[in-house]
Amino acid sequence: MMKTLSSLLLLFSVSLQAAPIERVISLAPHATEIAYAAGLGDKLIAVSEMSDYPEAAKKLEKVSNYKGINLEKIITLKPDLILAWPAGNPAKELEKLEQFGFKIYYSQTKSLKDIGDNIEQLSQYSDDPQIGLNNARDYRTHLEALRAKYQNLPKTRYFYQLSDTPIITVAGQNWPTEVFRFCGGENVFDGASAPYPQVSIEQVILKRPQAMFVSPHAIQNNGMWSPWVEEIPALKNAHFWQLNSDWLNRPTPRTLLAIEQVCEHFASIEQKR
């Protein structure tokens, strides 16, 4: 493979940065959604395997997945711009793409603000930048409206479960922590050293969360928490909810839907107090 890549490098070593942006590849589902919001949908030629929104993205060629990036395919497609996800795409493979001279936009989406910024920044590559500028503006306006609506929610200790075997959660500033924090949530595993730590049922019991959230695909065993109803306040008080994982786990304009979903659940707890 290295010999093939070396040959291709000789063919495409000229920098592409000066070329007009007509062919775009996205290496992450959230970057694909943001590209469409920025007005780049007509320029997308390939995306990641899990890029399933909007519907048009499903028809595009697939060049990456959780295992890595198909470098040879990307090189033969000759993109003018690659949308990469530094937190999810292999750094070494991104470095190789840089060495080939490809223009790469790194989608940094660690905060709610970053979503609007990404849309606005990518709009410059659209034939009609106003599409992205309008969508970025609408996103920010809606975000501020939600902030005004839910800013007085009390603090609620929560646990968010990403998977069940093993049990994985989120810690620190890692996505989607800010969505929960926006709604007054306090992560019971906020201080964990790993960004997405593996935890045990016993640890969750000791943390005594007031609310528990899962993604639909996270629970293969629907009864895994049943024996602990009396031990965990969230379960005892029926504060256990499934969330739309695409809305929540992908930092895109649809995150606004996740915010409303989470905030409404926290608000329902307050109504019972």
From Swiss-Prot:
GO terms for cellular component: periplasmic space. Transmembrane segments: none annotated. Keywords: Disulfide bond, Periplasm, Signal, Transport. The keyword Disulfide bond applies. InterPro entries: ABC_Transporter_SBP (IPR050902), ABC_transptr_periplasmic_BD (IPR002491), ABC_transptr_vit_B12-bd (IPR023544), Vit_B12_bind_prot (IPR054828). CDD domains: BtuF (cd01144). Residues 23-273 form the Fe/B12 periplasmic-binding domain. Disulfide bonds join C183-C263. Part of the ABC transporter complex BtuCDF involved in vitamin B12 import. Binds vitamin B12 and delivers it to the periplasmic surface of BtuC. Belongs to the BtuF family. The complex is composed of two ATP-binding proteins (BtuD), two transmembrane proteins (BtuC) and a solute-binding protein (BtuF). This is Vitamin B12-binding protein. It comes from Vibrio vulnificus (strain YJ016). The gene is btuF.
